[in-house]
Amino acid sequence: IVSTFQKIIVLEDDLVPFPYFLSYMNAALDMYENETNVACISAYVYPVKSKLPETFFIQGADCWGWATWQRAWNCFEADGKKLLEHIESNALQKKFDFDFTYPYVQMLKDQINHKNERLKAFSACCFDFLWIIFAALK
């Protein structure tokens, strides 16, 4: 699909999107199409108490309704070892773990070493987790 249309909108099969979901995604895909530091558009953010702007940037991605372009898809790195090397060689552990409040780097190490207990608890398959890491590094 991505090679035919140069972009894709992805939903998990059990999601019921907000009525304006497709309009939001298509507008965002058009708006950020040439922004190479933007790897994807996510439609979910964890609930927060403060009022957020209509659109904003966050580190990472979410697999519960997202969109991307062929340019980002073609750059996707599925090798967890290479992603970990990049994180460690650029001293990004603290940033990537949100000031060490969540063990994403350890989860990546566990994924590399085939110890997926945290990923199972996180309800993420290996692809989802690697895509989230890739997007965060963009």
Task: Give the predicted meaning of each segment.
Residues I1-V10, L15-K138:
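An acidic/histidine-cluster motif and surrounding catalytic segment
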